[in-house]
Regions:
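Cleavable N-terminal signal peptides
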Residues: 20-21, 31
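Divalent metal-coordination and catalytic microenvironments
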Residues: 47, 130, 186, 221, ...
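Domain-core and long-helix interface of multi-subunit machines
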Residues: 134-144, 148-241
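N-terminal secretory signal peptides
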Residues: 1-9, 20
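Charged catalytic cores and adjacent phosphate/nucleic-acid-binding surfaces used
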Residues: 34-40, 198-292
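A metal-dependent hydrolase metal-coordination microenvironment
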Residues: 40-163, 253-256
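A general structural detector for well-ordered alpha-helical segments in enzyme core domains, enriched
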Residues: 57-61, 91-98, 118, 171, ...
Length: 292
């Protein structure tokens, strides 16, 4: 078995090159965008990981960039390999206590399908929101496969890409319909061998199935600054359907709050405050209103 260092290429590692490549190009626009007055909604980055940073370092950065952060640490069983994985009520409550009183939203990024068994409803009710994505996918043997890792495509049977895409859309719907989530992140991401044919695989019919589920279960879709997803065609269809959005960087220090592409899409779509999700009060959050 390979060492953890060789095996554990996380989303953080996968994104590092993307973020680094985009920072120099977009930094001036991001700085301007965060303080812009042409938008009628507050600028919030609801996909921020502390990982090995600290809240004391992150809060001044949020103030400097004029962006409110939603902190999310990974949550689920210890089988998930990330710098921080919250796996029980005690760990979750300590995390919430650490963020208490700070000018940030308290969230988690839920992992796989078994994360709900790690926490009580009372513990989850202390969060402002719950986020997840679809990038961990069932392999041919039913085990979890992180689709961005080397060798993943063979494990999920990607020889028939259309068949995989149908399963992938089903997976989106299963997660949205069965998990008490408020936000779906990294929306419409595709494995490397498919990413160049985005419009071919994300047909209007497939997009509609995801949007219908998001509307039915009150799940907002992230406009991801790091992945520059969903593409504009998907976003326009989502806006026309009445789906709500949030903005997210998937950033680690010091790259959080860099929302240039997300804000560009918000302007292109003509989004206003009513189109944007913001964490609601107790009773309106997914962990309060959904059965699980």
């Amino acid at each position: 078995m390979a060492s953890p260092a060789k095996r554990a290429m996380t989303r953080r590692g996968f994104l590092r090159g993307t973020v680094a490549a985009g920072c120099l190009i977009l930094a001036p626009r991001r700085s301007h965008a965060a303080g812009s007055t042409d938008l009628d909604f507050p600028i919030e980055d609801l996909h921020v990981h502390l990982d090995n940073s600290t809240i004391d370092k992150v809060v001044p950065l949020a103030k400097e960039r004029g962006v409110k952060f939603g902190i999310v640490e990974h949550a689920g069983t210890k089988e998930n390999q990330y710098p921080i994985v919250l796996s029980n009520d005690a760990e979750l409550k300590a995390y919430v206590a650490m963020l208490e009183g700070q000018p940030v939203y308290k969230g988690i990024q839920a992992e796989w399908t078994d994360w709900m068994g790690c926490f009580s409803r009372d513990a989850l009710a202390q969060l402002d929101f719950i986020l997840t994505d679809t990038m961990t996918f069932p392999g041919k043997d039913g085990q979890r496969v992180k689709l961005w890792l080397e060798g993943a495509e063979a494990k999920v049977g990607l020889t028939d890409k259309e068949a995989f895409m149908d399963r992938y859309v089903d997976w989106h719907i299963e997660i949205i319909s069965r998990q008490p989530i408020d936000l779906l992140a990294n929306v419409s991401w595709l494995p490397g061998s498919m990413a160049g044919e985005y419009e071919k695989f994300w047909t209007e019919a497939r997009v509609k199935r995801v949007l219908d589920a998001a509307l039915k279960f009150g799940v907002a879709l992230e406009i991801s600054a790091s992945f520059k997803l969903p593409r504009l065609s998907f976003l326009r269809q989502a806006k026309a359907a009445g789906v709500r959005f949030c903005l997210g960087s998937n950033g680690r220090y010091p790259n959080m709050g860099q929302l240039g592409w997300s804000l560009e899409m918000a302007r292109t779509l003509g989004l206003n405050k009513s189109d944007l999700y913001t964490p609601g009060p107790p009773g309106l959050r997914a962990a309060d209103r959904r059965k699980f």
